Amino acid sequence: MSTAPSKTFPDGSPDVPLLEIQGISCNYGLERAVYDLSLTVNKGEQVCLLGPSGCGKTTVLRAVAGFQPLLSGRISINGQSVSQPGEILSPEKRRVGMVFQDHALFPHLSVEQNVGSGLRTLSAVERRATVSEILERVGLMRVAQRFPHELSGGQQQRVALARALAPRPLLLLMDEPFSSLDLDLRERLGQEVADMLKANAITSILVTHDQNDAFAMGDKIGVMAEGRLLQWDTAYN
């Protein structure tokens, strides 16, 4: 498999979809996991892929992130091809942020150090300014000096979100980020995150098996089953 040439991704243009998935098929191990799936996400949209475990939704997310090769089809970000059979742009060059159920914070680093851990190319002054801005945005400034073990589950997930947003990605990918939280906290945090993403026009894809999460956060919802996209529409259509 060849690596695609280096590309520069400017901020998303309003004239092209931020993400375009065209007829992709993928395997999970030796088994086919995704069949001929197509969808488009515009700049500033929050969309969800909803379906049971094993339906292929996480495989789609991994393909968008650059961790999953394609058997067929094409993925484009901001009008530029990033994946097709035999060619894949590496994840770190895609301007994509990721938040997973296992937020995997560095236990020996403070909140602000965790958030700044992916900003090594910035100067110290620029890094501090960026971290402060992101922590303010997600409501974590007052715990900036604390360590992960001193935080609640909801706070830890906010740190993971802040860390994903710090490099200013074009697209935020979230894989079941709230499923380990209790119901009340999951609903509250999900709504807070949805409000923050909308207020800042951040384009995102949420993968979930929970219909409540999908309807709380999705401008559009894609329903998946057995590797196929069965429905793709606005949340209440």
Name each region found by the language model.
Residues F147-L151, Q155-Q157:
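Conserved ABC ATPase signature
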Residues L172-E176:
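Catalytic Walker B motif of ABC-type/P-loop ATPase nucleotide-binding domains
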Residues L109-G118:
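Short coil-to-helix segment of the ABC ATPase nucleotide-binding domain corresponding to the Q-loop/switch region
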Residues A166-L170:
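A short, proline-enriched helix->beta-strand linker immediately N-terminal to the Walker B motif
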Residues Q80-S83, V125-V143, D195-A201:
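Conserved ABC ATPase "signature" region
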Residues L229-D233:
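ABC ATPase "signature
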Residues V82-G97, T121-A129:
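ABC ATPase NBD coupling module
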